[in-house]
């Protein structure tokens, strides 16, 4: 099992370290084999050591299906105008989305990533509050399969292509038929699942303890039967936001800004309260990880700055070591 630390690949993150050797030393000290990176909107430094980046999280828009379908009335309803939508996405129509994915796949290949991660979900700002869905999971999965097959066609990519679960419409890892629909549709031999433990916990708002969360993850693995063998990677964190969701969803806040970007910023803090990305402290997750035996495990923990990030990752790795899951 290779263990990674999640880190945005941009100048602000890199500035927290005194060069690449300092970053490499930090990873070694923590017991990580490298990074799972995500593009930060900037060109990568030319001297970025490629061996540091083991995994690569592909770019994503939480709300992309109407862009891909070129459903302009829907975009106007959400953004207020097509001009605002164009500025947000960098263009309009399906090719805007596809080209951004192609460019990101090229970045991953150039870095020598061993795997890439692709979100399969769709949620608008309003849905994030109301929990009243505009699209079904089947719609999202079918469109995602179409996108994936389009961007992967015509080239032998040097990495595994892993789909990540969310708790919005799309791939949730709570319905084996939907999971099979997704995996069967992807025309890529080197494919699999990146199971996000916190996202799976978000799918069950009745959970109140880490132990309950671990049991629920185990139950979903049971439910999936032989499909569970498709899990090749894990995003390890925990999220117990059911009480918050119960009190703060089902309706739109009265004073949401009219400007889309202001509304986006305000809703982002709401989503962070749902998707908490906290480190595990309960050993209840250890038998689950032993059962999965992932090839890649990323410590994807919310933190502010280098010190907090290192402390959170270190604590979670200590927990794994207690269970004899120290890595490769």
List each model region and its residues.
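Histidine-acidic metal/acid-base catalytic patches
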Residues: 1-3, 98, 102-103, 112-114, ...
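Aromatic- and acidic-residue-enriched segments that line the glycan-binding/catalytic groove
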Residues: 65-76, 135, 249-256
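A short acidic, glycine-rich active-site loop
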Residues: 83-94, 138, 266-277
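N-terminal pre-domain/capping segments
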Residues: 1-103, 323-328
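Active-site acidic/histidine proton-transfer and metal-coordination neighborhood
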Residues: 90-192
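Amphipathic, non-transmembrane alpha-helical secondary structure
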Residues: 21-25, 43-46, 98-109, 142-149, ...
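Hydrophobic faces of well-ordered beta-strands that scaffold small-molecule active sites
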Residues: 2-10, 33-37, 52-58, 116-118, ...
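Acidic-and-aromatic substrate-binding clefts and catalytic sites of carbohydrate-active enzymes
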Residues: 12-19, 31-47, 62-66, 95, ...
């Amino acid at each position: 099992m290779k263990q990674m630390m999640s880190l945005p690949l941009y100048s602000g993150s890199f500035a927290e370290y005194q060069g690449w050797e300092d970053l490499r030393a930090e990873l070694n000290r923590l017991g990580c084999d490298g990074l799972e990176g995500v593009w930060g909107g900037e060109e990568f430094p030319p001297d970025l050591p490629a061996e540091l980046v083991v995994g690569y999280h592909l770019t994503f828009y939480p709300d992309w299906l109407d862009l891909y379908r070129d459903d302009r009335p829907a975009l106007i309803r959400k953004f207020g105008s097509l001009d605002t939508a164009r500025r947000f996405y960098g263009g309009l129509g399906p090719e805007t989305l596809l080209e951004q994915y192609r460019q990101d796949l090229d970045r991953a290949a150039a870095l020598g990533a061993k795997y890439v991660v692709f979100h399969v979900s769709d949620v608008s700002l309003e849905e994030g509050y109301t929990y009243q869905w505009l699209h079904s999971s089947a719609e999202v999965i079918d469109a995602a399969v179409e996108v994936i097959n389009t961007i992967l066609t015509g080239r032998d990519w040097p990495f595994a292509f892993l789909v990540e679960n969310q708790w919005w419409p799309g791939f949730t890892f709570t319905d084996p038929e939907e999971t099979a629909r997704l995996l069967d549709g992807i025309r890529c031999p080197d494919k699999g699942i990146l199971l996000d433990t916190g996202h799976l916990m978000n799918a069950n708002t009745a959970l109140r303890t880490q132990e309950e969360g671990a049991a629920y993850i185990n139950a979903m693995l049971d439910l999936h039967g032989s499909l569970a063998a498709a899990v090749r990677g894990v995003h390890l964190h925990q999220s117990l936001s059911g009480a918050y969701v119960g009190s703060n969803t089902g309706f739109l806040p009265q004073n949401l800004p009219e400007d889309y970007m202001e509304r986006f910023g305000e809703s982002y803090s709401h989503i962070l309260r749902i998707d908490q990305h906290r480190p595990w402290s309960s050993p209840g997750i250890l038998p689950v990880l032993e059962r999965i035996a992932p090839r890649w495990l990323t410590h994807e923990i919310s933190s502010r700055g280098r010190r907090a990030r290192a402390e959170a990752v270190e604590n979670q790795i200590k927990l794994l070591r207690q269970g004899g899951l120290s890595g490769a």
